[in-house]
């Protein structure tokens, strides 16, 4: 993840079939709507609630919006699973992968920000250590309450999260 005024990051550019076709800076990829890779992780507790994070106002996309438990781009040459493990550690302080499971794959499209997305799920009860540079807040929320919140106030959420959540809930 890149905050405003940080170094340039390069990601793999991929085709519609998720095959690597090049390498480009993050900003160029986003400006030109090139297909690239990302991961999202939904973390659930034993009560069945999901953890949501509120993005820092310093983020360059969707600042201050509620999103997945964690998410991020897949680095060049990195596997999706490894990116999910890395993002869990960086954003919310979970440094393990024992029950991290692939739940869904979404092909790159406008609704995903032109990202091929692998959505993972895992369970966790206990403390989370939020990275204050990336995350401004976090909550555990009941799934039905989240559905209602999204229905009543979709503006509170990153649009890509809303898309993925609705696909996940089908």
Task: Describe the role of every protein-language-model region.
Residues 3-40, 46:
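Acidic, metal-coordinating catalytic segment for phosphate/diphosphate chemistry
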Residues 41, 70, 102, 118-120:
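A structural signal for short, well-ordered beta-strand segments
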Residues 38-70:
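A glycine-rich, hydrophobic loop/mini-helix early in the fold
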Residues 32-34, 61-66, 141-142:
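A short, polar/proline- and glycine-enriched secondary-structure boundary/capping micro-motif
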Residues 51-52, 69-102:
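The catalytic Nudix box helix
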Residues 27, 64, 104-107, 111-170:
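Nudix hydrolase/Nudix homology domain
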């Amino acid at each position: 993840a890149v905050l405003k005024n940080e170094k340039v990051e390069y990601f793999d550019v991929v085709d519609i079939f998720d095959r690597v076709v090049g390498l480009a800076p993050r900003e160029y990829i986003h400006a030109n709507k090139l297909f690239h890779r990302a991961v999202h992780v939904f973390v659930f507790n034993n009560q069945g609630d999901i953890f949501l994070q509120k993005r820092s106002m310093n983020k360059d996309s969707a600042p201050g919006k509620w999103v997945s438990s964690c998410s991020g781009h897949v680095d060049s040459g990195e596997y999706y699973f490894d990116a999910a493990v890395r993002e869990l550690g960086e954003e919310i302080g979970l440094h393990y992968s024992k029950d991290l499971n692939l739940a869904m794959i979404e092909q790159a499209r406008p609704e995903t920000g032109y990202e091929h997305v692998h959505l993972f799920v895992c369970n966790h009860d206990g403390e989370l250590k939020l990275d204050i540079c990336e995350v401004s807040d976090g909550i555990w929320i009941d799934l039905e309450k989240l559905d209602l919140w999204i229905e009543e106030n979709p503006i509170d959420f990153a649009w890509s999260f809303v898309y993925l959540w609705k696909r996940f809930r089908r």
